[in-house]
Regions:
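Nucleotide/phosphate-binding catalytic cleft detector across ATP-hydrolyzing
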Residues: 1-43, 48-168
Length: 168
């Protein structure tokens, strides 16, 4: 895996101010990496720290009344929380969702408790959001580079996840 960090021109105060300069800088760096590795990239996972991400934590719950927690229950809960996010902040898009806590009958569970029986299931989720226009600009730049973005992540989130993983 290759990592490259290059100061970008055309970005000021976390806003793309010149899409052509940003595209030129990124495409030149991609070309150099492709030449060095002798490959042509078709898609990418983008880790960025030049933009201001918003973070919203929400909890959702499902009354089970002694029944089994099913995948459909969790899917419904996730979709309803995503809908809440889109109603709360229509100018931003969800970039990443992180499950931070699972509770079954008020007891913390380490893994998704699909298949377990209980009376009440609750889940806390953290939503990372990015401004819609910033997101459109990012996609436009990488489309011009003939790269499909598979995922966008915040650099601070990735560093935090690595720190947690290295400590366990």
């Amino acid at each position: 895996i290759h990592s490259n960090s290059t100061p970008l021109v055309g970005i000021q105060d976390n806003i793309i101010t010149d899409i052509n300069l940003v595209h030129k800088s990124i495409s030149e760096n991609i070309y150099l990496i492709e030449q060095k590795l002798n490959v042509v990239f078709k898609d990418t996972v983008l880790v960025i720290d030049n933009f201001r991400f918003s973070l919203i934590n929400l909890s959702g719950f499902k009354k089970l009344n002694g029944s089994q927690l099913k995948k459909e229950n969790i899917t419904y809960l996730l979709n309803s929380l995503k809908l809440n996010i889109s109603e709360i902040d229509i100018e931003k898009s969800i970039i990443h969702i992180f499950s931070s806590k699972y509770l079954l009958d008020k007891k913390r569970i380490e893994n998704l408790p699909i298949g377990l029986f209980g009376d009440l299931y609750s889940q806390e989720l953290s939503f990372f959001l990015l401004n819609n226009n910033d997101l459109k600009n990012i996609y436009e730049i990488f489309n011009k580079c003939n790269l499909r973005i598979r995922k966008i992540m915040s650099k601070s989130f990735v560093e935090g996840a690595n720190l947690i993983n290295n400590n366990f």
